[in-house]
Amino acid sequence: MTSDRQDRPGPDLPRHERRPRRSPSPRRRSRHHSSRRADLRGRLGAWLAAGVVAVLVIGVTGLYLLHHDSPVRHLATGTSGAAAGPGGQPGSTPAPASDTGTVSITDVGDMNFGMNGHYPPGGVGSLFAGVAGDLHSSLTVGNLETALGSSGTTKCGAGSTECFAFQAPAASARAVRQAGFSAVNVANNHTDDAGAVGIQETDAALSAAHLRWTGRPGQTTYLVRHGIKIALLGFAPYSYDRNLLDIPAAAAAVRRAAARAQLVIVFIHAGAEGAAAQHVRPGMETYLGEKRGDPIAFSHAVVDAGADLVLGSGPHVLRAMQWYHGRLIAYSLGNFAGYDTLGLDGVTADSAILHIRLRANGTFAGGSVTPIRLVGAGSPEPDPARTGIALINSLSRSDLGASGVRIAASGKIELARR
């Protein structure tokens, strides 16, 4: 199996995912014998007919259950965000008996591991030591904001002091995998830091480490957890990523993914950067003359198209979280890890780890936030002051009002009030 599968135009499913046609039962031939044998054959025929009916009923049921990632199945279980229930309340529509399974998802913010030969002396894995117990779930993901490898051409000109090109050794991918990560988003403004060769080396390093990735143009990544098929799509406002600025195309890609998978998770690398970029507002955001997308409009559009969870990165600060049609949108989890590559003054050092459980039909089954703070050169550690919770609550309330997520002091994500 390849690490990633590209979207194909049109709604047709691959051959192995199509519902097989049921062959008609063969007709039984009979000959006229004695009346006694005819009577026995008549009774036998009745028994066989009853058996065939039972087999057909079981067979049809089996086909339905085995091919549960068909478009019809999604409409029935409400994977489309618009079917979440009155008021868009999470959990307002009880999960059907066949959708009682859940997937636990852990998400972190932006991570890179150094540049220009300056890397953690204890290895990349040492960056995660302080939060090692928080990175294990059915699916642990994050935003990989660096190229991996040793070749390629840097995007920065000679002697540049305002340009940052991140590239870490290919072995860094193995350290990320060993820390507990299953997949990473590569749709961001640093995936091209070593040019086209760097992109190829990054993909090769991730593949060798058995670490899945998403975010290249046209790329949708599929994986299975606990029998639940999950689609991952990443978007950013750059030509070498899946395009965040074309909302209709993004929505169409999500609809195709929702027709093939039970859960759809969308990563967005969107918005301005830095301490002044904590607030999320409607409209296009810009930074350094670049259009960085409209995070709210984009997130709402992909949920309307069938996304069950939207995970944001890019601003390098914590941002608000929102309930929209019963689906959770986290606009930014801030920084997660770096090595002398991230400005860590004030709010840029405050971060969080998001833990979510989703049912197979996409509805919210529970979640929590672990507040962390980056210390030293950029290592995450638990934050005793729990600043991240207070920040997310404040931003969610001020920026999003009633749809803003509320997090209890314990870190538990509360259901939206009806």
Residue ranges of each PLM-predicted region?
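Acidic, metal/ion-coordinating pockets
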Residues: 2-21, 26-32, 36-37, 42-418
